[in-house]
Amino acid sequence: MEMPLPPDDQELRNVIDKLAQFVARNGPEFEKMTMEKQKDNPKFSFLFGGEFYSYYKCKLALEQQQLICKQQTPELEPAATMPPLPQPPLAPAAPIPPAQGAPSMDELIQQSQWNLQQQEQHLLALRQEQVTAAVAHAVEQQMQKLLEETQLDMNEFDNLLQPIIDTCTKDAISAGKNWMFSNAKSPPHCELMAGHLRNRITADGAHFELRLHLIYLINDVLHHCQRKQARELLAALQKVVVPIYCTSFLAVEEDKQQKIARLLQLWEKNGYFDDSIIQQLQSPALGLGQYQATLINEYSSVVQPVQLAFQQQIQTLKTQHEEFVTSLAQQQQQQQQQQQQLQMPQMEAEVKATPPPPAPPPAPAPAPAIPPTTQPDDSKPPIQMPGSSEYEAPGGVQDPAAAGPRGPGPHDQIPPNKPPWFDQPHPVAPWGQQQPPEQPPYPHHQGGPPHCPPWNNSHEGMWGEQRGDPGWNGQRDAPWNNQPDAAWNSQFEGPWNSQHEQPPWGGGQREPPFRMQRPPHFRGPFPPHQQHPQFNQPPHPHNFNRFPPRFMQDDFPPRHPFERPPYPHRFDYPQGDFPAEMGPPHHHPGHRMPHPGINEHPPWAGPQHPDFGPPPHGFNGQPPHMRRQGPPHINHDDPSLVPNVPYFDLPAGLMAPLVKLEDHEYKPLDPKDIRLPPPMPPSERLLAAVEAFYSPPSHDRPRNSEGWEQNGLYEFFRAKMRARRRKGQEKRNSGPSRSRSRSKSRGRSSSRSNSRSSKSSGSYSRSRSRSCSRSYSRSRSRSRSRSRSSRSRSRSQSRSRSKSYSPGRRRRSRSRSPTPPSSAGLGSNSAPPIPDSRLGEENKGHQMLVKMGWSGSGGLGAKEQGIQDPIKGGDVRDKWDQYKGVGVALDDPYENYRRNKSYSFIARMKARDECK
């Protein structure tokens, strides 16, 4: 392929060369971005099929080829220093794949194909524009020719059309119609007038009133053409009515289209046009397209040269694309030939240097250097295991368990200082089949099972992401030998580290490079690798990483407490049972003693709930029988519960334990008091609440307009109101004169005598001191006789009888002689639980209010601004307060101040009257 000539302008040449280099390095996405940004820049017309497009494509191909060669050259150099591999001498050499980041041949071909398509689309758009411009120019020339033939004054016609456009009166339309009929002397005259109307209506800047009023003029002319039999003018209007009507109809909205459509109905009714024209007018888009095609055929002599020029450009682009593809194929073939020529001497030398394969030894080597091979169908290469020197016991002490007799099989290849379960591949049963349970998993090793059950399949890459770290080589010997290991003890006693780089089963260690084997009861493929949940980060709105409750319950056996949970799947199950074929691990001095009830279900979980997720961040790694059941109090000194990120990065739900139920006013929280939740299983109530939250709305659980449950927080607000009342009651009872005043007086508040006393009628019984005296008298009346109690109550409550408007008293019972639910001692200072005075959901009024949109969580009213408790039946109010509405505060400070001032004023007036 010959190199096209570069542009003479050095600046433009530099732009093309630099862009070719950038596109070769960054890929076709960079070219797309450049085309979008520089689509209006004339300097970048070469990207859209303009001049020097061929030079740009050739330059781009050369840059890509040079980049591939530069990246392949360093790969060929170290190949000579590699150790010889036992390959067949005549095996064909595979082509060297392109370096990472360099586009392959298929990518280059696809990029060229995409460029070709973009160029074709751009050229087609340019062709359409040029064809339209050529047709418009031809039409204008035709109009000029008719104007020269007829010698009509179009300025006079425009002067008559302007009043029609402005006012559209009958006189203006009549004047325009008369001028047209008076000048319709020949077909050229008629064509000139009709063409002038078409140009005025189809112009780009024409507004709707101009088009509509001129169409009204055409309608009037058509009517008179039919009456006067003016066939020449009618034929001229038939040629231009399609673009006039279709353009006006498609350029306006629907309400304005109806005005134009009425004219079409009138034309169809009167029969001004034939059926073909009526069909085009009924489908404006189709009719306009047919009209444009007619113009192209009519002016084909002007259109064909434009179309041929663009067709040649498109064909040139296709030819360049084909040549580019052919050039790439040839270059690839040449590279393969050169590669074969370079590798032939090397392969011959390898064949000569390769010794004959030795006979298979009778016994395997004690420490093989080559990693164990996997099954032939494994798609991944086996993971390189550490050498045997890394697993020697410290101090030269050998594992006494390894000296025992071993059975035949793969265990014979294991050195005596390595546990047999460490890197021994286990046979994997096909999917859908379980391994036979006759053989115990560890028949020849005296130690317990590993902390992580070995999995051996093609999914070991999930656990092999961090094995390149040097930290893997620092593992100690297996903890089930007789040598205590302090580092292993930290795996059970040290809390999990919050950093995601460290696995959750070690204080600072990483997972040993076990051969991972899929669980025997797992029936499906493994999900992608997932990290453990980050509880020190804001949570996702919905955790879809966990399976729903009781998912595949019968397919997973329970696990032993010392086993690591199947971390990639985020499954967790009751951690009490251990499979029957695998006993509990042998005791080791570095381990905790197993609980006596290790084979029993823990008290907080059973086999019915295998949906417990992984323990939260901060779990200290203890087995479940060493943990308490639902710790009622959080140990704030526990370092595993202290978050190590700023408080604003934590989930908002961690603030909930710091807000007490009785708190109702703003109280700033101390970020140092925030603690992570302790490990505890979800309760039945929590699981039921989660299921109810995601359940669809029903009649019992309606939703509001925003999609939330209507009464979802009713119980919470109800409990919060109870706690708030209880706190207020305790504050009132904790005073020096009322320490025992309200303890048992509620039960007797309704059974007092109804006697009155005239002595207290003139006293100010509504003050706060009067309320205190009543409380004091009632508290003392419990330890006296009934008559004295009655006398004390009658003296202190002569006007209020048995009621008080103090905040602690909420509602009077209907019964005349209620009794307290429980009788504590006379010296008891604990207040009895205050019964809830709010109406329950069984109340008809409550149900009616809920149906009308009341949420039920606050006060009455649309904005919940009213009272929250039912109206008290017998509240005694002052004379000026008795007619106030429901929900009006009676302890308004301004009203109280005005009332106190009025007392002094009335007293002065009475004193003045008495002096007179």
UniProtKB/Swiss-Prot annotation:
Query: Which keywords belong to this entry?
Result: Acetylation, Cytoplasm, Endoplasmic reticulum, Isopeptide bond, Phosphoprotein, Ubl conjugation
The record's SURP motif repeats, renumbered to this chain, cover: 15-57
**GO CC annotations?**
cytoplasm; membrane; nucleoplasm; perinuclear region of cytoplasm; sarcoplasmic reticulum membrane
List the InterPro entries hit by this protein, alphabetically: CID_dom, DUF7819, ENTH_VHS, G_patch_dom, Surp, SWAP/Surp_sf
One of the entry's Gene Ontology molecular-function terms is: RNA binding
- Which of the residues bear the PTM N-acetylmethionine? 1
Query: Site of the Glycyl lysine isopeptide (Lys-Gly) (interchain with G-Cter in SUMO2) crosslink?
Result: 844, 872
Q: What is this protein called?
A: Calcium homeostasis endoplasmic reticulum protein
Q: Where is the composition biased (Polar residues)?
A: 480-501
Q: Where is the composition biased (Basic residues)?
A: 739-749, 767-815
Compositionally biased residues, Low complexity: 750-766
Q: Which Gene3D superfamilies does this entry report, sorted A to Z? A: 1.25.40.90, Surp module
The protein's organism comes out as: Homo sapiens
- Comp. bias intervals (Pro residues): 354-374, 525-541
Give me any GO biological process, just one: intracellular calcium ion homeostasis
Q: Which PROSITE patterns match?
A: CID, G_PATCH, SURP
